[in-house]
């Protein structure tokens, strides 16, 4: 890292993360293939079609009863108005019995509507949650069948968002959109029919306001979209900056870069403020515009209704019902617009989910697989060629024979292909040409699970999960007893420090295992590998994260562990592999030297150059 204070400060590298949360007014993401994604989703929902049809029927019936309410209520208003007029004229009174019957009938309509609405909501929620449950299960199962190259070409957040963000978005949109479409369309049609039954003239007057409101709303949306996009873009920038600063706060403090960090944040925050203010202001205009246009409609209906009532064409109750219908008429239009956005979100989310489910899988099993009772541990690389891309071969004609129980060290500069060889051995990738044999059988003739059961691994990047230390070590062999776990910890020289921790083996590690040191993490993963007791071991910089004193203790434990087992050790510190039975020196994907430590030093070749360079100072 540069120590030049004049150089512009750069944030620590970004950690993989999923999509940012949706901010207010975020532009709805659209699917690339809306029709295709919708077809796949409909097919996926096939087992629930009977329930979905029931939901549609219940939603329609609920809406019919609800729409009928205002007109029935209008009869009570008319009866009340006529009764008052008769009472004033002295020709009669108010018929409260009739009004009571009308009100009870109206109440019954709304109760029945609510019952059907409750039923359809209950059924639809069940469909949605079952779909999300099944989809998460399918995605999780799919992850276990995916090739390693898929995950290495994507961030963790991108993959995990399929299970979290995309499935949640799909579930929420699915739950709301189906019933909302049926309800809104039924309400729109039913309301229009009721309005026409009361007065075609008043219906025409009320419909004239719709184009006006649409034009005004379209104008506002058109001018606010660019600010919404900018708002969401800079919201993502700010979220990213906050996460990076939090992850690298020690580096920032160490280099006294707090002021530069705050300045960078303020610049992005100012842009976010301006775009958010404009977008929210323009967005806030829509409701006043709708209310203003709606009031114009009410005024038109009131004037025309009053004239028609004077002429005895319609009653006062009809005017009251019609005003209610005008109010209800604009609501489903707004709901349909919202549903259109939900459908776009649902299609986009389902598209990403189905794209993932349609990804190419690796072959988990093979026909007539090799199933040896016991793997001895002989390994042969026979003229192996490999490239992550077909047109870029990085390992060229790699050949080596390893006898059972031998300790093989693989050394070389960064990018020489050391870790790639391990990935090929574990069948995380398949060779482009040539073959890798274990106990004389091509590893492609083994089921992947059977092959990987033969390997124990300790990697440079430690992985521990949230749970107790005992559970983390036992992950190497789930049926191991507590005594076997403790014995493995002792062999890995981890027992002593575990006993000093609060709770000992029952201490709970947090999500990132940040409540133990990096060296302690490595000791725990070594204990896990010892417990697994696999015939073939892979150690990729297994002692790189511990101090020299701890390294010596671990190296002794590993020497005992590797006796009688075939071991592949990838190391940059060449002092740790002096006792290896064979050292393979790699450069640019090829083995350029092979032999023991002393033999290679005597050759005074590339290995000797690497070894001496580590002790020059």
What are these regions (language model features)?
Residues 20-29, 129, 137-161, 165-167, ...:
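Short intracellular "coupling" helices and adjacent cytoplasmic loop segments at the cytosolic face
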Residues 2, 365-366, 372-617:
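ABC-type nucleotide-binding domain
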Residues 52-116, 197-201, 312-316:
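Transmembrane helix-loop-helix hairpins at lipid-water interfaces of multipass membrane proteins
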Residues 46, 104, 116, 120, ...:
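Hydrophobic alpha-helical transmembrane segments of ABC transporter permease domains
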Residues 148-149, 167-174, 178, 186, ...:
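An intracellular "coupling" helix at the cytosolic face of ABC transporter transmembrane type-1 domains
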């Amino acid at each position: 890292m540069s120590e030049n204070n004049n150089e512009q400060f750069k944030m620590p590298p970004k950690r993989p993360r999923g999509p940012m949360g949706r901010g207010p007014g975020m532009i709805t993401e659209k699917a690339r293939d809306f029709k295709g994604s919708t077809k796949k989703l409909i097919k996926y929902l096939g087992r629930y079609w009977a329930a979905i049809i029931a939901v549609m029927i219940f939603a329609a019936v609920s809406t019919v009863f609800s729409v009928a309410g205002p007109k029935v209520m209008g009869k009570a208003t008319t009866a009340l108005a006529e009764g008052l007029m008769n009472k004033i004229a002295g020709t009669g009174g108010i018929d409260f019995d009739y009004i009571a019957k009308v009100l009870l009938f109206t109440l019954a309509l709304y109760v029945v509507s609510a019952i059907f609405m409750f039923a359809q909501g209950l059924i639809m929620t069940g469909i949605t949650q079952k779909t999300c449950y099944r989809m998460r299960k399918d995605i999780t199962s799919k992850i276990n069948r995916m090739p390693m190259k898929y995950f290495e070409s994507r961030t963790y957040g991108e993959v995990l968002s399929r299970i979290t963000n995309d499935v949640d978005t799909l579930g929420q949109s699915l739950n709301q959109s189906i019933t909302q479409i049926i309800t809104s369309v039924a309400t729109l049609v039913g309301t229009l029919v009721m309005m026409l039954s009361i007065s075609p003239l008043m219906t025409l007057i009320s419909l004239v306001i719709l184009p006006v409101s649409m034009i005004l709303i379209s104008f506002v949306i058109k001018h606010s979209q660019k600010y919404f996009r900018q708002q969401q873009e800079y919201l993502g920038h700010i979220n990213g900056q906050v996460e990076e600063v939090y992850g690298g706060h020690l580096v920032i403090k160490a280099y006294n870069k707090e002021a530069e960090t705050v300045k960078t944040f303020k610049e992005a925050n100012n842009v976010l403020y301006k775009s958010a203010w404009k977008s929210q202001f323009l967005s806030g205009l829509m409701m006043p515009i709708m209310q203003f246009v709606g009031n114009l409609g009410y005024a038109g209906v009131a004037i025309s209704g009053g004239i028609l009532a004077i002429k005895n064409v319609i009653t006062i109750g009809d005017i009251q019902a019609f005003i209610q219908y005008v109010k209800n008429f604009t609501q489903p239009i707004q709901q349909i617009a919202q549903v259109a956005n939900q459908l776009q979100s649902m299609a986009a989310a389902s598209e990403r989910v189905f794209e993932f489910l349609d990804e190419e899988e690796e072959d988990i099993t093979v026909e007539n697989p090799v199933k040896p009772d016991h793997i001895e541990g002989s390994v042969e690389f026979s003229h192996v060629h490999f490239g992550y891309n077909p047109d870029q071969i990085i390992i060229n004609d790699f050949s080596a024979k390893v006898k059972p129980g031998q300790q093989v060290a693989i050394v070389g500069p960064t990018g020489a292909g050391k870790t790639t060889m391990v990935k090929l051995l574990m069948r995380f990738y398949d060779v482009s040409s040539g073959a890798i044999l274990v106990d004389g059988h091509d590893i492609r003739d083994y089921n992947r699970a059977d092959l990987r059961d033969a390997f124990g691994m300790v990697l440079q990047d430690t992985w521990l999960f949230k749970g107790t230390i005992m559970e983390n070590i036992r992950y190497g062999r789930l049926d191991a007893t507590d005594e076997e776990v403790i014995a493995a910890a002792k062999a890995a020289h981890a027992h002593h420090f575990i006993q000093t921790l609060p709770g000992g083996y029952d201490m709970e590690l947090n999500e990132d295992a940040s409540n133990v040191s990096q060296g302690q993490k490595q000791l725990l993963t070594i204990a896990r590998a010892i417990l697994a007791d696999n015939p073939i071991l892979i150690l990729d910089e297994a002692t790189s994260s511990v101090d020299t004193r701890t390294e010596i203790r671990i190296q002794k434990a590993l020497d005992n562990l590797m006796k009688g087992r075939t071991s592949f050790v990838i190391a940059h510190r060449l002092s740790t592999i002096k006792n290896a039975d064979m050292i393979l020196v790699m450069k640019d994907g090829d083995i350029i030297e092979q032999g023991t430590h002393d033999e290679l030093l005597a050759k005074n070749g590339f290995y000797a150059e690497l070894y001496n360079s580590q002790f020059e100072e």
